[in-house]
From Swiss-Prot:
Annotated Gene3D superfamilies: 3.40.1280.10
Alphabetized UniProt keyword annotations: Cytoplasm, Methyltransferase, S-adenosyl-L-methionine, Transferase
GO biological process: tRNA methylation
Domain of life: Bacteria
Main location: cytoplasm
Subcellular location: Cytoplasm
Biological source species: Vibrio atlanticus (strain LGP32) (Vibrio splendidus (strain Mel32))
Keyword Oxidoreductase: no
A single GO cellular-component term on record: cytoplasm
Record protein name field: Putative pseudouridine methyltransferase
Entry EC no(s): 2.1.1.-
Keyword hit for Methyltransferase: yes
């Protein structure tokens, strides 16, 4: 099982703002693009992939929306509009939830009022965490554990205080090359490397 976490620091937790944020400061299109490139392949979708989108621009709690490729039945297509609609349905389903509550949205999609920090602490129990860093080991040379989880951010970098807690969780740094890439581009390269290795 391969897992991805997108920490979307600018992404709002209100459906109207998600839809209005495409191409604006929130850059909510990154949610759809990352989701598309993690789960979908031509005429099908990948098995054994989990994607966690953590939306952090909120008045109450972050929303962690989880997509399980093995459980998803019909997401409505893999174009930007359909994928953002799935995110919106999850956000709408989360209204009225208290902190650290979980709710099933539809097959393969759950929403939790859970922070990024709490999520990665939970994932670290049975995954090896990897963070993108230009100074990390180049992915083609890096040793990738059996249950990898890759941590990505939107256009707002990971806050410095997060690095220490991620280090304590045993997070390893890997590099995808000399250029800074979009999260949606990172997942294409990561998936390709894992495919070539026969993961």
């Amino acid at each position: 099982m391969r897992s991805f976490v997108l920490r979307a620091r600018a992404a709002p937790t209100e459906s109207k703002l998600i839809l209005e944020g495409v191409g604006q400061d929130a850059h909510t299109e990154i949610l759809a693009h990352t989701l598309m490139n993690t789960i979908f392949v031509a005429q099908s979708h990948r098995e054994n992939v989990t994607v966690h989108l953590v939306l952090e621009s909120t008045k109450d709690f972050s929303r962690t929306i989880t997509f399980d490729s093995n459980e998803i039945t019909n997401i409505g297509g893999f174009h930007e509009s359909a994928l953002l609609s799935a995110v919106v349905r999850a956000v709408d389903a989360s209204q009225g939830m208290i902190k650290e509550q979980t709710r099933q949205v539809e097959p393969g999609i759950t929403v939790r009022t859970m922070s990024f920090e709490k999520l990665v602490k939970e994932l670290a129990e049975d995954h090896q965490l990897y963070m993108m860093d230009k100074k990390g080991d180049f992915i083609r040379d890096a040793e990738i554990a059996e249950n990898p989880c890759f941590l990505l951010t939107d256009h707002i970098p990971m806050p410095k205080k997060s690095y220490n807690s991620l280090k304590r969780l045993g997070t390893e740094k890997i590099s995808l090359g000399p250029n800074m890439l979009f999260a949606s581009q990172c997942v294409v390269l990561i998936n390709n490397e894992l495919d070539v290795r026969g993961f």
